[in-house]
Amino acid sequence: PDFSAGAMENTGCITFREVILLINEKQGAIALKKEIASVIAHEMAHQWFGDLVTMKWWDDIWLNEGFATWMSSKPIEAWKPEWNFKLDDVIDDGRTLNTDSLASTRPIHQAADTPGQIMELFDGIAYGKAAAVLRMLESYLGEETFRAGVNAYIQQHQYANATATDFWEAQTKTSKKPVDQIMPTFVEQAGVPIISVQQACAGNSTNVTLDQRRFFYDREKFQAPNDQLWQVPICMKGSAGKETPECKLLTKREQTFTLPGCSNWVLGNAGATGYYRVGYQPEAVLALATDAEGKLSPAERIALLTDIWASVRVGREPVGDYLAVAQGLGSDRNRAVIEDVLTRLDYIGEYLVSESDRDSYRAWLRQYLSPMMKDVGWESKPGESDEQKTLRARVFYALGYDARDPEALTEARKIAGEALDNPASVSHEMAASAFRLAALNGDGALYDKLLALIKNAKSPEEYYMALFALPHFEDPKLIQRTLDYAISPEVRSQDALRLVRNVMQSPAGEKPAWDFILDHWSSVQKVGGPFASGEIVGGTGSFCDAHMRDQVTDFFTAHKIESAERTYRQSIERINDCIELKSQQETKLASWLGEHGSAAEGQ
């Protein structure tokens, strides 16, 4: 049967979607294996966090979902350390920070009384932010101390209900630290702080002045006075200091601390466990970029890239600075670091590059990505790691999709043909990327072959690989065919709106999909139901056009969805932020590409 959630933690009878349980162990994509492991661990964690101890009311749903998300990483790290699951947590934290940088975000602890308001609480804040804050607290207290506090909390409230206050009290009592003062600043108020770092040498030490304020993507709000304050456990390390971070508690608007050694840079989120953004001086960004690969851990490199991108988003840095840092990490072969960079390079290419500069940007990307592809190779090697397999598929896709590299696109058509003729002959990582790349210039014959695979798939993974290749077709007739197919009885209702949303989030399908939704709204709602319709509302946040924003505003003002009211506000804000970012950075990017992209074109 169709199942709206991925899984459900019923005591003694956990239920799952088939795709979260059934996988070809030999061929299955590593990313799907990780997702399956994560969901299973999440639901098992709910047996304690949610079932044994249950929140008193829905306003504390994060006690269930945040704890289960935090806990789900633990058994996977112990079972498969080679998957580097902690790095995926850091990437996920970056996505959560994006949502929490919107003015329309909410506090973790949020009042809710109606069914629609309650449904809205099951979001990235309840899961992602709550888990990130718990990881920060665990790092601040130490694993053993934090675990002792969790045990005390569970023992005191087992087979009963609890609140956030109950948890803070248990941790404060166990740790003898002011947890009950620190955590409410992250749980009871919305948003995220940015900690600005300024350093100056004083003999053989470095004075580090930290200043905190709330971070907004909205530039006017970010620059306006704001009286919010957090009590922030912050860990730092300097270029001249020890490997072990210096951890302090920032409780005021501005405080100065001293680190050993005279450093030319100070990393403001050492270990990458802090839930905050960091703002650096321009000269420190350059110094950090130079030393990043040698002196920062992969997690710290990801957090640094996230912080620099945030500074670009609010105009503190030109987009060229981010590209320069990415270029400086050109020899980095850590799967998670590269994955994080490629996500932003895709965003830049889709939203910030003008049509006149597209060829230059793609040429720069080919120059950047080709050495990576050469290193990982087109085919797997005996004994290679799961990280290497994942990296190959990710770089392959970026080279074909973002850079439109002719060799990658030719290889994609070849691999797709092999996978369609004999699915067992190709790894699912490469097959999924190849299907999507082949679809870009694909015709009706390829479309029909993918439909046949959807109907005759021997595993849920094969089914979804083919299904979610369909939104990549750029032929207008095939785009329309996918939209009609999505709301037909041939597609399961649990998948229908995600398929429509994926078409809507592709450059070629954006306008046709939105027009389709406007013309077929009653059918879309019938297929997805009132709660699932929020999938479409959230999908509009990928638009970057004032006219389409106005259409979204008019339509969802007339067709309100109670369970997606905040999602709607966030989508409008994301559109506005993108429009503003494009207006601020497009010319700067053109200038940067004039110097770097043109040189790449000439090679």
Which residue stretches match the model-derived regions?
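Hydrophobic alpha-helical and helix-loop surface patches within well-folded domains
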Residues: 1-214, 218-223, 340, 344-347, ...
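Domain-wide signal for the mature, well-folded portions of proteins, strongly enriched
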Residues: 18-19, 52, 96-100, 105-111, ...
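Long, ordered, helix-rich scaffold segments
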Residues: 93-94, 211, 224, 245-247, ...
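Short, glycine-/Ser/Thr-/acidic-enriched flexible segments
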Residues: 21, 75, 202, 213-216, ...
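A short, hydrophobic secondary-structure junction motif
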Residues: 39-40, 231-241, 373, 442
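Amphipathic repeat-derived elements
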Residues: 41, 45-50, 174, 233-238, ...
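Short, glycine- and charge-enriched coil/turn segments that flank and shape catalytic ligand pockets
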Residues: 173-177, 201-205, 242, 293-295, ...
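Beta-strand-rich binding/interaction modules
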Residues: 179-180, 190-269
